Amino acid sequence: VNAPKSPYNLIQETVQYDPWRVLVVCIFCNLTKRVVAEPYMWQFFDRWPTAAAASHADPAEIRDMIAILGLADRRSKTLVKLSQAYVQWDGVDVRSLPGVGEYAAAAYDIFCLHRWAQIPEPKDGALKNYWKWINGKEESQVA
């Protein structure tokens, strides 16, 4: 079961079948506009399609690929650390994974656990719009 598609067409909606990808999208979109980050994110997924593959990536190769986005050194190291931790992860506390802050945790709760009604309103603008939309939709379906 997937979270419903919204008129906002968030990238997380497209990759929600893979929780690792949801988290990676959040790292790419953190402090970077979607329109700028998206092409590089898809290049990343083409090169490293799974957490297991990305866990063996050379951070320098990722850094060179995403240099234009800014924060490339930090992001590249975080992507590898996240992937390494993810393949070992017990699935309990997503916030324990490297690079997972409030934004990524909220996206994970919404798109992977389908807990949009149980979490507080996210602070991220696009995620907040989705959260409002889906919670409004839930209420109108019940009424």
Please identify what each model-predicted range represents.
Residues P7-A143:
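Catalytic cores of DNA base-excision repair glycosylases
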